Amino acid sequence: MKSMRFSYSRVEAGQTTASELAYLPITLRTVNGSVERQGLLDTGSTVNVLPYTVGLALGFAWEQQTIPISLTGSLSKVPAYGVIVTGRVESFPTVELAFAWTQAADVPLILGQVNFFMEFEVCFFRSQAVFEVKPKASQK
């Protein structure tokens, strides 16, 4: 399957190109809901991170979660639980994505090493402010 190219996005209007980041449009689904969001591609993040409000929109109930996750860095003191959702990027095949669903609402949807970068090949062309994404080779 061919790759798709995306442009870097500015987080806030009026900022310089130095503040542009790699945000990827992605659709997340569960049996209880579906959302379209912009996920921050973060090669330095060990895990995918799902903000609290997005988890609620997908139909998750905090009190019913049973798989605690310990986050690191700026989220180290915030409780999180492991959840699985179906993810779709453009016309690529859907994949199961594991997220650390955090109670923090002020964090972006983060696509990290586990397991976004295990499901997709990503190539960054920062000097051109673009990046390419394609499904991993074994995915047809």
What does each model-found stretch correspond to?
Residues 1-140:
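Pepsin/retropepsin-fold aspartyl endopeptidases
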